[in-house]
Amino acid sequence: MEPNMLMRFASVSKLITAVGIMKLQEMKKLKLNEKVFGEKGILRDTVYNNSIKDKRYYDITVEQLLRHQAGFNNYAGDPVSSTRYIMMQNHLKTPPDHPTLLKILLKRHLGYTPGEGKCYSNLGYMILSMIIEKKSGMKYENFMQKYVLHPAGCYDMHIAGTYLKDRRPNETKYYMHQGSIPVYEYNNSGRLVEKCYGDTDLPRLSGAGAWCGSTAELSRFIASIDGLPHVKDILSKKSIEFMTREQTDHQYSIGWNYTPKSNKPWIRTGSLAGTSAIVLKYPDNQCWILITNTSTWKGHGFSNDTMAFFEKLRKKYMANMPKKDLFL
């Protein structure tokens, strides 16, 4: 494993997508209080509006998508990673693209009134990816690279592939934990595959969890959105402060999981089959990142173990760490 090797970011991708939305707002192409659906919504296409049965969809705003407050729930499973079941339920011969999937999901009732609850939602960030395409007139990946990643000095970040054959030349391999069993391929082929290579169609996760890159470039990206002077920020101070404003009642920050203002780090986590990722941005301006290429049976609980491990390392070694800016 080398520092420049590419690894899947999983839901750390959401932070990248959120920065793309904030960039569009700074470009005056979008407002966070804009409605997403309806006759005057961003995604006002007739095919979407004709699918809506629950009128509360018309109240969903961009900011509610960013904060996981748009009314979506996962009681019937995560719709973005349940492609095989959606294909069977809707008698589809091929996996649905984003417009087809959204048209299907809009027929469902919301789990709660937008803005009056919260539920972590991959669907919300898939929709944000579609909004970026609609407002920019560009493919999601192309817009993000041109206006977000390249200005941040990140030139080797890409939408990841699903299978081992899709692996980039400098990308790691992914492994399942001991005792894991094969699963049915996402496209309803009936084939059994290793979960990290075929359970989920990664490009369809898009801005919810599909980015890959190196930990070195990810750390540079974080440095470009932290509001500090050592690396030039790609967003305004106002946008960064808005994204990282501490939320009451443990609500989600924009892009980040949580951004407490006490003596605790900003947190962004991610988890996929074959991947666990965590980014911690501490008040002393240190950024600690861990991305694995192997699954753990602990799932999301692995992030809590990692945070505790980081704290032990910081207490034991931080005083003797070299005071060197690695971005110079």
Language model features by range: what are they?
Residues M1-Q64, Y112-S121, S206, W288-I289:
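Short active-site loop at a secondary-structure junction
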Residues K28-L32, M138, L228-I234, M321, ...:
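Surface-exposed helix-capping loop/turn segments at secondary-structure junctions
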Residues S262, W297-L328:
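Short, gly/Ser/Thr-rich active-site loops of penicillin-recognizing serine hydrolases
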Residues S276-L280, N285-K298:
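Short, well-ordered beta-strand elements
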